Amino acid sequence: KVGILTRGYGTPSEHSIVVSADIDPDEYCDKLGDEPAVILRQVPEVIVVKGKDRIHAAQVAVNEHACEVLILDDGYQFLHLARNENILLIDSQNPFGNGKLIPRGFLREPLREIHRATHCVVTRVTDDLDRAEIINAVRSYAPDVQIEWTQHTPTRLLHPLTGVEQSLDIFSGQEVVAACAIGNPEAFTRTLEDLGMTVIETHAFPDHDTISTEVFKSKHPVIITEKDAVRIKHPPDNLFVLEVELETLETTTPG
């Protein structure tokens, strides 16, 4: 039985403990957060425990819900909870920023802390990516770590008002509007363009925010992410949701 521990960014009462098994599915997004809501849509049998106190959340998951495996969301830096595996994600499009820590740069920790990783997953890999920089950096601190190269692959385009699945190429060669409240809106726009769509506008909102209904007044199809879709209670007819999955392209083993 798997439990996921999350801070629940963008939700009220972040300090209190909220468990997915104790609330209605319609409340997942409001009480747990958008990302946990997406996970529970895809894997409804998992237990999500939201709370700022990660140790307390872990105790609730194990003692009250019999969880045998715990996944700590966004927990690489949280050193107060022992773990068996440490999965490090690296964004291939900006792997190490300017080498500086927040707020002078993008890094949360110095590069030397790569040594704590037991697995490394490189995301948003493109065909023209020069992998040498990433391999050399990882190997210099964690020589025995396996590196997985991945990309977000579109799987389907859903019309949420009717629940009808559309072909991924239905808007190929047509003008569309992109809207999202994610950390990297440029990547979402590129994905739509790779599917042949002509993106005439991109409305980017702060991460974990709700897309303004003003966007839906467009005469063009509006494409959003699955993460954004869980926040929209009454989808309009021109709204479509692009769903993606993480695909492993290749694995680089030590040696």
Model-assigned labels for residue ranges:
Residues R7-Y9, D74-Q77, P185, I224-R231:
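Short, polar loop motifs at secondary-structure junctions
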Residues V49, I90, T150, H203, ...:
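Hydrophobic residues at beta-strand termini and immediately following loops
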Residues H56-V60, E133, A187-T191, R231-I232:
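Phosphate- and divalent-cation-binding pockets in alpha/beta enzyme and binding domains
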Residues P95-P221:
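C-terminal accessory "lid"/substrate-recognition subdomains
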Residues T153-L157, F205-T210, D237-G255:
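Short, flexible loop segments at boundaries between secondary-structure elements
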